From Swiss-Prot:
HAMAP family the record matches: ChlL_BchL
The protein, known as: Light-independent protochlorophyllide reductase iron-sulfur ATP-binding protein
Pathway membership, UniProt: Porphyrin-containing compound metabolism; chlorophyll biosynthesis (light-independent)
The protein's role, per its UniProt record: Component of the dark-operative protochlorophyllide reductase (DPOR) that uses Mg-ATP and reduced ferredoxin to reduce ring D of protochlorophyllide (Pchlide) to form chlorophyllide a (Chlide). This reaction is light-independent. The L component serves as a unique electron donor to the NB-component of the complex, and binds Mg-ATP.
Endpoints of the signal sequence: none
Taxonomic path: Bacteria, Bacillati, Cyanobacteriota, Cyanophyceae, Oscillatoriophycideae
NCBIfam families: DPOR_bchL
Molecular function via GO: 4 iron, 4 sulfur cluster binding; ATP binding; metal ion binding; oxidoreductase activity, acting on iron-sulfur proteins as donors; oxidoreductase activity, acting on the CH-CH group of donors, iron-sulfur protein as acceptor
Family: Belongs to the NifH/BchL/ChlL family.
GO biological process: light-independent chlorophyll biosynthetic process; photosynthesis, dark reaction
Pfam families xrefs: Fer4_NifH (PF00142)
EC numbers, comma separated: 1.3.7.7
Oligomer and partners: Homodimer. Protochlorophyllide reductase is composed of three subunits; ChlL, ChlN and ChlB.
Length: 289
């Protein structure tokens, strides 16, 4: 059975870029990897392929939903380093359920026996939406990975995703592998959160402009490093993540914080972060002046 990962995180946090570079890192470690984009924008695999590949839902519509008329090469495309790529797609804007499309994608790939040939399957899932449909990849995953930054909103979203992992772990052998901090110059708020809600931190990537450029170019950092070896140090971050995942860590079943409690914890940290610490004796001296 392939090792299956589900990557979640706040919308716009760099989740797809992170997913593509992790997939490339896993391929560099000799693994056969399938990345499945689960977002109606169907741009999850752009960094691997360099173009927006046709979606499964588009292909199904072309075939009048006759699954028997679809072959693996109709929906699976080649990406950098031999990573295979699939985009689920979605319904027209404002109509239908994107989560339903994720289910149809898994159904089709199973009928094609597409999962059997891979060592690792990575689901890159839409934003921080954790409704039943978009939480569906957690039903198939061995591990969930949450991409965040050092900000309030991303960690608040991470906490909600952690709650989904805990709920799914009741009935599935699912664990949270940990957090990845993406393009952040600090990690103090991440540390504050994981002290409050214990979970591993797999890696924290610094504020490196080439990570953003990777997305815009439609190239992984590994492909960019093939042309500019000075970027090899950035690839090492993703290789470190890949090595941890391939080691099959124990992971955790997280116990998320209550929303109001987390809101208070994180907002207090922001509001008081720059205030100097004053001990009781100093405070008394100030009062007597």
């Amino acid at each position: 059975m392939p090792l299956t990962l589900a990557v979640y995180g706040k919308g716009g946090i760099g989740k797809s870029t992170t997913s593509c570079n992790i997939s490339a890192a896993l391929a560099k470690r000799g693994k056969k990897v399938l990345q499945i984009g689960c977002d109606p924008k169907h741009d999850s695999t752009f960094t691997l392929t360099g173009f927006l590949i046709p979606t499964i839902i588009d292909t199904l519509q072309e075939k009048d939903f006759h699954y028997e008329d679809i072959w693996p090469e109709d929906v699976i495309y080649d990406g950098y380093g031999g990573v295979k790529c699939v985009e689920a797609g979605g319904p027209p804007a404002g109509a239908g359920c994107g989560g339903y499309v994720v289910g149809e994608t898994v159904k089709l790939l199973k009928e094609l026996n597409a999962f059997d040939e891979f060592d690792v399957i990575l689901f890159d899932v839409l934003g921080d939406v954790v409704c039943g449909g978009f939480a569906a990849p957690l039903n198939y995953a061995d591990y969930c990975i949450i991409v965040t930054d050092n900000g309030f909103d991303a960690l608040f979203a991470a906490n909600r995703i952690a709650a989904s992992v805990r709920e799914k772990a009741r009935t599935h052998p699912l664990r949270l592998a940990g957090l990845i901090g993406n393009r952040t110059s600090k990690r103090d708020l991440i540390n504050k959160y994981v002290d409050h809600v214990p979970m591993p931190v797999l890696e924290v990537l610094p504020l490196i402009e080439d990570i953003r450029v990777s997305r815009v170019k439609g190239q992984t950092l590994f492909e960019m490093a093939d042309k500019d070896p000075m970027l090899s140090y950035v690839c090492d971050y993703y290789l470190n993540i890949a090595d941890q995942i391939l080691a099959k860590p124990e992971g955790v079943i997280p116990k998320e914080s209550a929303d109001r409690e987390l809101f208070t914890l994180l907002s207090d940290f922001y509001l008081n972060a720059d205030k100097p610490k004053v001990n009781a004796e100093e405070e008394l001296d100030l009062m007597m002046v």
